[in-house]
Amino acid sequence: MDKIQRVRSAIAGHDVDRIPAGFWTHFPPAASTGRAMADAHLDFYRRSGVDFVKVMNDNPYRLVGLDRIDRPSDWRRLRPEPRDSRGRLAYLDGVKAILDAVGHEALVIVTVFNPFATANDNRSGSLDFSDLTFGGISAHLKEDPEATAAA
């Protein structure tokens, strides 16, 4: 049984030769996009022997139109990041390199964070995971739900 068959069979509730294994890690900022991201993930995959690749997304959402979000009204000024932004394309290039290298032998799962966590963790203009209770975004939602939800 190969890795793809093992994972798909386990998900479907069928018998497997062994329980599929998967674990992942966050890589340094220098390995967050492009070829460096692909190389870090592929090296980890090959050294660990996991049954699938989980691609991390350690890239902050770029705050277009402002530097940081301090007040609920700031959310109204936030603009979508262009689909063809350099950072986004570099990340997708890294994902493609991973798929090209191992997509035939293992399933590849790409991390997509939910909007609530993304908004909370990016209010400072860079990734900041210190607000584990989501107090900042929750306070903004309570104070001005329309402005916050519009983002």
Describe the role of every protein-language-model region.
Residues 65-151:
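Active-site-proximal, glycine-rich beta->alpha crossover segments in alpha/beta enzymes
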Residues 1-70, 93, 97, 103:
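N-terminal basic, low-complexity leaders that serve as flexible interaction/assembly modules and, when applicable
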